[in-house]
């Protein structure tokens, strides 16, 4: 991870921890989740909003006024709305996408859920996803949601990432290992 990305992730994580703790104290995790989903959708749909949070040309006051208006219009959770206003004052709105990801992860962890990133050479069938979900749930002891992607360069097998753990049973990695072993011998 590059240094600026890790700095952004660190900033986002600190805000996420505070927002989550306050929402939890207020027993409003559902409202927080709704706000996260709404903001994620708005960021995906609105180039103007993405420009607002990323542009250094927009002043603090303009950013704060705009994000406050957006929060009011979207009827966001008060904790989230106040945090966005504070982030605008501190010129930290550029970390909003990472903040939303960190908050989503915190909510999933509070519910005892974890997301597994699964890459396969071809699309997994519904039965394969169900079996993999069951197996991973037993291994990690939590409810697992699978985020499946197709990567034809794997040739065959799977690459599974759950949290900081990765299991690579792809043909590509086995061929790379074999190639490295042959280089050592020859």
From Swiss-Prot:
Q: Gene name on record?
A: atpH
Sorted keywords for this record are:
ATP synthesis, Cell inner membrane, Cell membrane, CF(1), Hydrogen ion transport, Ion transport, Membrane, Transport
Q: Origin, by domain of life? A: Bacteria
Annotated signal sequence range: none
Q: Name one GO molecular function term.
A: proton-transporting ATP synthase activity, rotational mechanism
Task: Provide a GO CC annotation, any one.
Answer: proton-transporting ATP synthase complex
Name the UniProt record assigns to this protein: ATP synthase subunit delta
What is this protein for, i.e. what is its function? F(1)F(0) ATP synthase produces ATP from ADP in the presence of a proton or sodium gradient. F-type ATPases consist of two structural domains, F(1) containing the extramembraneous catalytic core and F(0) containing the membrane proton channel, linked together by a central stalk and a peripheral stalk. During catalysis, ATP synthesis in the catalytic domain of F(1) is coupled via a rotary mechanism of the central stalk subunits to proton translocation. This protein is part of the stalk that links CF(0) to CF(1). It either transmits conformational changes from CF(0) to CF(1) or is implicated in proton conduction.
List the HAMAP family.
ATP_synth_delta_bact (MF_01416)
> Taxonomically, what lineage is the organism?
Bacteria, Pseudomonadati, Pseudomonadota, Alphaproteobacteria, Rhodobacterales
Q: Which membrane topology term applies here? A: Peripheral membrane protein
Family of this protein = Belongs to the ATPase delta chain family.
């Amino acid at each position: 991870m590059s240094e600026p990305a890790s700095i952004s992730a660190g900033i986002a994580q600190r805000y996420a921890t505070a927002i989550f703790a306050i929402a939890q104290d207020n027993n409003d995790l559902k409202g927080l989740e709704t706000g996260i989903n709404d903001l994620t959708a708005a960021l995906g749909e609105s180039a103007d909003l993405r420009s607002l949070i990323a542009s250094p040309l927009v002043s603090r006051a303009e950013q704060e006024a705009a994000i406050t208006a957006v929060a009011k219009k979207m009827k966001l959770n008060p904790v989230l709305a106040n945090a966005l206003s504070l982030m605008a004052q501190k010129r930290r709105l550029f970390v909003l996408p990472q903040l939303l990801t960190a908050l989503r992860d915190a909510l999933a962890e509070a519910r005892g859920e974890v997301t597994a990133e699964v890459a396969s050479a071809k699309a997994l069938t519904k039965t394969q996803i169900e079996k993999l979900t069951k197996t991973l749930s037993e291994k990690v002891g939590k409810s697992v949601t699978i985020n499946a992607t197709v990567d034809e360069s794997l040739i065959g097998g799977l690459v599974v990432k759950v949290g900081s753990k990765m299991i690579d049973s792809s043909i590509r990695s086995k061929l790379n290992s074999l190639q490295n072993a042959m280089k050592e011998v020859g």
